[in-house]
């Protein structure tokens, strides 16, 4: 039977009342009772004897304290998570050469072998790009669109379908149809939607989500002069940006890593370009090629001191789920023409084609040695 509330209250108060009746403990109370009985007189003493109260046993002796020791007791701690050096806290992405930074979310393996060339410029336009193109997808090319036409020719010869545009709205809406997006010297705020009078950042969002799905990005030459005010894009370039360059001059390119994109490219070949100086300098990437700075005359272009110890010109990385293959080379028209008359044109075109194919996932990407 459940006791009443009053009974519960009484039970809860009982220990407190008992404690208040004998504040000095049971043992002292028993001794007092015996003393009072003794004071009451023999057979005729006054007052009845107090009831018997049991004497509480003496407390057991406490154990001796432990002997002093020099041993420092272990301090319990939370388990420490392993630090993942593939995560870049500055750009808030997983990036580098570890394939775990790749997300196979976009079903790009079943996507047709198709790439999109994006060559819109929002700043000084390189001569190799020619006259700006009309809006839309695959507008008519002009005879001076040398870089775009050269890329179409080179990649089509590999069985790759190539589309092209300088329309930022087309890029934002169609980007997921391609295994790789090629930024062909597209520069400055090339993804700013103010170019098409929109108020939303659709192109940037589309590129970021495309990379996170496992897309491929190829940046050529002045793609390093784009989106200076968007840190995500700087990270996509490998933590690098164009700062300045010296005269357009000859130098020797050296392949520094074995990779599917450098396969069968001579370990050293002559080339002519602007040899971009970079700020910041790329990090957490796989360097593929450099320029031998001893062959550059002059080396520097004030105020940048140049990269005398190591001047990279091509590299690759996984970035935020996708693949990024990058080169600062590609300034001159003769590097893209079919007659291969330019110094180093054969080697350069082979390097670019193989870089695009690796970014598409057609060959192994950015392999570690």
What residue spans do the PLM features occupy?
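Short, Lys/Arg-enriched N-terminal segments with co-localized hydrophobic residues
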Residues: 1-15
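Bacterial N-terminal signal peptides that target proteins for export
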Residues: 15-28
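Bacterial Sec-dependent N-terminal signal peptides
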Residues: 33-87
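Aromatic-Pro/Gly-enriched surface loop or interdomain linker
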Residues: 68, 72-178, 356, 364
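Catalytic beta-strand/loop cores that center a nucleophilic Ser/Cys/Thr
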Residues: 88-101, 239-326
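A glycine-rich, often tryptophan-bearing local segment used as a flexible ligand/cofactor-contacting loop or short
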Residues: 187-267
């Amino acid at each position: 039977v459940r006791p009443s509330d009053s009974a519960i209250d009484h039970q809860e108060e009982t220990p407190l009342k008992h404690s208040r009746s004998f504040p000095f403990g049971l043992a002292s109370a028993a001794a007092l009772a015996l003393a009072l009985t003794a004071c009451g007189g023999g057979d005729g003493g006054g007052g009845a004897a107090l009831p018997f109260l049991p004497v509480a046993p003496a407390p057991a002796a406490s154990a001796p304290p432990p002997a002093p020791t020099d041993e420092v007791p272990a301090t319990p701690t939370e388990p420490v998570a392993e630090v993942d050096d593939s995560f870049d806290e500055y750009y808030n992405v997983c990036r580098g050469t570890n394939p775990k930074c790749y997300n196979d979310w976009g079903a790009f393996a079943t996507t047709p072998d198709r790439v999109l060339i994006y060559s819109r410029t929002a700043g000084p336009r390189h001569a190799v790009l020619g006259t700006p193109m009309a809006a839309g997808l695959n507008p008519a090319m002009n005879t001076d669109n040398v870089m775009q036409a050269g890329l179409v020719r080179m990649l089509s010869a590999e069985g790759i379908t190539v589309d092209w545009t300088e329309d930022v709205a087309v890029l934002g809406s169609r980007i997921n149809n391609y295994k790789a997006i090629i930024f062909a010297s597209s520069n400055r705020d090339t993804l700013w939607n103010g170019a098409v009078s929109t108020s939303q950042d659709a192109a940037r969002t589309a590129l970021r989500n495309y990379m996170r799905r496992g897309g491929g990005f190829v940046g050529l030459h002045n793609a390093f002069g784009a989106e200076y005010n968007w840190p995500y894009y700087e990270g996509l370039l490998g933590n690098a940006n164009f700062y300045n360059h010296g005269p357009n001059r000859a130098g020797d390119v050296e392949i520094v890593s074995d990779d599917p994109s450098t396969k069968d490219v001579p370990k050293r070949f002559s080339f002519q370009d602007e040899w971009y100086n970079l700020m910041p300098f790329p990090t957490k990437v796989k360097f593929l090629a450099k320029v031998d700075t001893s062959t550059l005359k002059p080396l520097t272009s004030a105020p940048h001191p140049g990269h005398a110890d190591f001047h990279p010109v091509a590299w690759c990385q996984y970035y935020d789920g996708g693949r990024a293959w990058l080169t600062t080379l590609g300034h001159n028209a003769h590097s893209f023409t079919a007659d291969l008359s330019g110094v180093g044109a054969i080697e350069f075109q082979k390097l670019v084609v193989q870089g695009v194919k690796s970014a598409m996932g057609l060959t192994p990407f950015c392999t570690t040695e």
